Structure formats: structure tokens, C-alpha cells
Amino acid sequence: MREMQLASALTTRPARRILFLCIHNSARSQMAEGWARSLAGPEVQIWSAGTEPSRVHPAAIEVMREVGIDLTKQASKGLEDVPWQTMDTVVTVCGEGDEVCPVLAADVRRVHWPLPDPSRVEGEGQLDAFRKVRDDLRWRVASLLPRGD
């Protein structure tokens, strides 16, 4: 049901060059990049970046490893490190989506997923918060990709 709702909210044009964007490029955008690389075919190019990059959060690495996706080779990147001007789809994955998104060409599809920041959860509940965002991202990312991937 959620996949159908999300798919209907997007245009029918399949995403071929996707940028996942947030502030620190440490958790949500990194997990989205990991899912997209895992689920997409070779014709889809995928990046993630942040407006104030930091490091990939260890809990993001851990929970993605649980589903067989290795984030250890991914790094936190700034917009200057990715070809953001060439994207056909930019997905903001934080509550500050409009504030962090650069000025884009009119034909760039902008998608906003206001996901909670799991790194703000402290203590024993943090890994569960990361898992919840990880699982939510999986179906969202899958809905962006061309059918059959």
C-alpha cells in the first residue's frame, strides 16, 4: 500500500541519475545510497552527499551489514564532490530538505522524504531507530528505480 502511494506521487519517468542529499551525509543518505546500489541495475548512477559532510555513522554501517550491504567503502561527501548539476532526481532525506537542497534546473525531479534522524536517539534504542529508517528507506528507494531492477 505504501509503495503504491509513493509511486503514484512520483512522475512516471524512471530515475537514472539519483542524488540522496542531507546535511551531514552520515546516516540516512548513506543508507539510501547503499540500498540504491544494491537494488538498481547498472544503468542507474547513484550518489549521496551532504551540505556539511562529516563521517559515515558506525550504526548505519552496522545495520546495513545486517541486510548484507557493505557501507565501509562509502564516504561522507559534500556537494562539491558529486556531479549534482547533472542529476535527474534529487532526494532529500532529512527534515530540512528545502533548506539543504541546491538550486536545481527545472527538469530535475525533487523528492523529499522527511525521515527522522536516528543518530539523535541515544542509548539502547539507537540501533532500533537506525533499523527502522533502514527498512523505511528500502521500499522508498525501490519505488524510485526503473521497473525490473
How would you describe each model-predicted region?
Residues 2-80:
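Conserved active-site segments centered on acidic
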Residues 84-86:
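Alpha-helix C-terminal capping/helix-to-coil transition sites in glycosyltransferase folds
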Residues 54-55, 81, 116-121:
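A short acidic, often aromatic-flanked loop/helix-cap motif at beta-alpha or helix-coil junctions
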Residues 89:
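Short, Asp-centered acidic motifs that coordinate Mg2+ and/or phosphate
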Residues 26, 95-99:
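Short glycine-rich anion-binding loops that position phosphate/pyrophosphate groups of nucleotides
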Residues 2-9, 98-149:
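Phosphate-binding/catalytic loops
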Residues 92-93, 112:
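Redox-cofactor binding/interface segments in oxidoreductases and associated redox assembly factors
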